[in-house]
């Protein structure tokens, strides 16, 4: 089905699913929804420790990051530099939490959304099955070629009119007047 410029083609992310967990006839899975994973907790901890006081917390922050990496056999990271460490954490979040809905909110929290999002197109993938049961993958525009825009004011939400009406001293966030 297609809605305006957006297409739904029944391709789904299979992260956390195995063939044994899937009922291929009814297209259902008994897999419970994962609300929070330990890897996310460790990455949150690593980032928070580094932001609080890198000089005091660097050993514990590195340990949290390396616990996530070590779980899948990746080599440990080492750095004496807070900025380099935070780049490591950001990259690890992209890889470890892919497809879980964190990226947009991470970009907002790090105040990188304007740099990363602005001017980008939303892409999809056209998957075509070949006669030999292999597949080809083609990147396609999913939004009619429109460029994404993230304004500085989007870092903060507008305060709802009902809340401001209830309290005349409550001012809206900057950019939402």
Predicted regions and their residues:
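Acidic/polar-rich alpha-helix caps and helix-coil junctions
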Residues: 1-177
């Amino acid at each position: 089905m297609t809605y305006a410029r957006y297409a739904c083609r029944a391709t789904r992310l299979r992260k956390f699913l195995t063939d044994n967990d899937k009922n291929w006839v009814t297209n259902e899975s008994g897999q419970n929804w994962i609300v929070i994973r330990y890897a996310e907790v460790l990455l949150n901890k690593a980032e928070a420790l580094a932001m609080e006081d890198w000089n005091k917390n660097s050993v514990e922050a590195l340990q949290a990051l390396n616990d996530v990496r070590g779980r899948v056999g990746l080599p440990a990271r080492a750095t004496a530099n807070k900025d380099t460490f935070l780049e490591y954490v950001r990259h690890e979040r992209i890889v470890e939490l892919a497809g879980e809905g964190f990226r947009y909110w991470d970009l907002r929290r790090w105040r990188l959304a304007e740099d990363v999002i602005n001017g980008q197109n939303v892409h999809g993938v056209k998957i075509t099955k070949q006669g030999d049961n292999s597949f080809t993958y083609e990147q396609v525009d999913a939004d009619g070629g429109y460029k994404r825009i993230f304004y500085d004011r989007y870092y903060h939400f507008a305060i709802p009119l009902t809340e401001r009406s209830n309290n005349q001293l409550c001012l809206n966030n900057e950019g939402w007047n």
